[in-house]
UniProtKB/Swiss-Prot annotation:
GO annotations of cellular component type: cytoplasm
Subunit structure: Interacts with the Tle3 toxin on one side and with the H2-T6SS component VgrG2b on the other side.
Gene name linked to the record: tla3
Annotated compartments: Cytoplasm
One Gene Ontology molecular-function label: identical protein binding
Start and end residues of each stretch annotated as Disordered: 410-458
Record's protein name: Type VI lipase adapter protein Tla3
Predominant subcellular localization, coarse grouping: cytoplasm
InterPro entries given in the database record: Tla3_C, Tla3_N
Length: 480
């Protein structure tokens, strides 16, 4: 065996794709594949995309009304998303993590929480969710500058590609996006009342933010091949399901292990078993971003110029997708009409997509409500599900920025071949499961004690006490 086989890669070519290794999503009362299923039921009932409404329940009884119960629902949703996205991932390895929330300006007057409190709270956000998510053996390592506060965070995706290129030893990254009424309240000024956001006691206010949380793991699986050379020499733990490295066995490797920034210890054979069990759900293609403003005046392009720019971007982004995109997930936010600009652009690009067909056209705000800063990642998650299950390709277009459009291709790892198994079921541990019902084939279990958060009136609690302080509750079985 060459000594080179024992060393990590030291350079990286330009990357055009990253593998989607895991996804987890909570969206209002839905979890994981329930969202895609609800969208398909809509399509079957209404073929015309313009006439499709929201999948969110219209019955106010489906939602909690007290402030405590609203906070409880938010806590469950954010923990469920992390559990679904991380539970089958490699344990004991600190996965580099990016946290994405809505825009926040520390210089805003009269903030609800001090900048120091907010920075600290966001920095521990994902790690603190491990316990309520039942992820006791998983490890989180925040990336430097890995807290992203941005209302239109699709730029994170290009940054991920650059990160992998700059760090050839990096095998995977977790992106955790968290949006909702509670997050909006925590990051806002006191001049914005919690009542206006829908965060206090009372029925749900139509048009308020949709709670949307996504855990997305992307990576390059081949980058751990050098660790396979060391694995046979690692000690087998007394608890054989424990993947942690606790030293060498009776034999030492012929080449000294040298830690890297992202691989501080050798991986055991059990760790590699967990890694190799991860499916590749999709290929995430490098985003294509184009300006929608005139280079001289800064004014937004209009009519033919806008159509030509969007058409050129579509051709570039879809060139690497095989087959051509079968559907488009797009989001212009509230009070926007993306179809008016997209339809002529796709026509000019000679795309076969029919954006008036509900099976091919998904306006995220129209169908899911306002998912805010989580929108690009909700689109990627849905595109991953759709393309994996159908063996085809999808396109995601965040369009909330008026000065720029971003196109993100998602393709099946096995084009033209539909899988036998659907991996997007709601498989939550009973002690952390949401009230959506027991996991498939699971025996009914008694309701577990619930954990909730509250913001005492008139008290300036730290952000983590608003979002993460724990209060036992056994008198309300949340249906969310």
């Amino acid at each position: 065996m060459s000594a080179d086989a024992y060393h990590p890669p030291t350079t990286s070519p330009r990357l055009e794709t990253l593998d989607v290794l895991s996804i987890g999503m909570s969206l209002d009362v839905f979890r994981q594949g329930q969202v895609w299923k609800a969208l398909q039921e809509q399509n079957a009932a209404q073929a015309e995309a313009l006439h499709v409404g929201s999948i969110l329940p219209m019955d106010p009884k489906k939602y909690p009304t007290s402030a405590d119960d609203k906070d409880m629902a938010y806590e469950k949703r954010q923990a469920d998303a992390l559990e679904l996205g991380l539970k089958n991932f490699l344990e004991k390895w600190p996965i580099p993590t990016v946290t994405v929330v809505r825009g926040w300006d520390p210089s805003t007057p009269n903030l609800r929480f001090t900048p120091e409190e907010t920075r600290e709270s966001l920095s521990v956000k994902v790690n603190d969710l491990r316990v309520p998510a039942g992820l006791h053996w998983h490890r989180i390592a925040n990336l430097q500058d890995g807290i992203i506060c941005n209302d239109t965070p699709e730029g994170v995706l290009e940054a991920l590609f650059s990160l992998f290129e700059r760090n050839p030893d990096l095998p995977a990254v977790l992106v955790y996006a968290n949006e909702g009424i509670s997050m909006a309240g925590a990051l806002s000024s006191r001049d914005v009342t919690l009542k206006s956001l829908g965060a206090v006691s009372g029925p749900r206010i139509p048009g308020t933010l949709t709670d949307a949380m996504v855990a997305l793991i992307v990576g390059r699986p081949e980058r751990v091949d050098w660790l396979r050379q060391f694995a046979p020499y690692t000690k087998v733990n007394e608890n054989r399901i424990d993947p942690e490295f606790r030293g060498w066995g009776w034999r030492k490797p012929p080449v000294e292990f040298r830690p890297t920034p992202f691989i501080p210890q050798p991986w055991t054979e059990r760790a590699l078993e967990q890694w190799d069990a991860l499916p590749v759900l999709a290929r995430l293609h490098r985003p294509v971003s184009v300006p929608l403003t005139h280079p001289d005046t800064g004014e937004r392009l209009k009519r033919e110029a806008l159509t030509a720019q969007l058409a050129a971007a579509w051709k570039t982004a879809s060139a690497g997708l095989r087959p051509a995109p079968a559907r488009l997930f797009y989001d212009g936010g509230l009070n926007a009409t993306p179809l008016a600009e997209l339809t002529p652009a796709l026509g000019a690009a000679q795309s076969s997509l029919d954006l008036l067909d509900s099976r091919e056209s998904y306006d995220l705000t129209q169908r899911l409500g306002d998912t805010g800063a989580a929108s690009p990642f909700v689109g990627i998650t849905l595109a991953t599900m759709a393309s994996y299950l159908n063996g085809d390709s999808s396109m995601v277009m965040p369009l909330r920025r008026k000065d720029q459009a971003t196109l993100i291709g998602i393709s099946s790892p096995t084009p033209g071949k539909k899988p036998v198994h659907d991996p997007f079921g709601v498989d939550l541990l009973p002690q952390t499961a949401s009230g959506d019902g027991p996991p498939p084939s699971a025996d009914p279990v008694a309701p577990a004690s619930r954990l909730t958060t509250r913001l005492p009136p008139g008290e300036d609690y730290a952000l983590e006490e608003f979002l993460s302080s724990l209060k036992p509750s056994t008198d309300w079985q949340d249906d969310l």
